[in-house]
Swiss-Prot record:
ANK repeats lie at residues 66-95, 99-128, 132-161. PROSITE patterns: ANK_REP_REGION, ANK_REPEAT. Keywords: ANK repeat, Repeat. Transmembrane segments: none annotated. Coiled coil: none annotated. The gene is ANKRD20A5P. This is Putative ankyrin repeat domain-containing protein 20A5.
Amino acid sequence: MKLFGFRSRRGQTVLGSIDHLYTGSGYRIRYSELQKIHKAAVKGDAAEMERCLARRSGDLDALDKQHRTALHLACASGHVKVVTLLVNRKCQIDIYDKENRTPLIQAVHCQEEACAVILLEHGANPNLKDIYGNTALHYAVYSESTSLAEKLLFHGENIEALDKV
């Protein structure tokens, strides 16, 4: 379930005083701390994303306080149009956030298969590990997503990768 706490024009959040968003996997997002490009990614607003990128192309890989890019947030939220826009603009696909999660790991963790496929087709490395030693395949297995696991293996995921446990 996704909760949204977007601010209205009067400065109040839609859900009262809540200023946190959660994606399907509990990816916590403090909306008030995000830059415009990150807000567009969370909302899935491809038109706003285009405007942000037109203003400053350097924003493509801008990091929030958790070292997440717009691509991380778009993948966690399942916004295929925004993910496609960002990868076509040549953003960094294998960039790590504070938990060493790549956008691919985040897409798989949130069970956003369409986003994961886009990343894989654009060269995302499926063998990178997060701080716990988990790869995207580990998260696909944890969520019992055989379809995602199959796609990861097809794109070269190492079936022998070990986590830190």
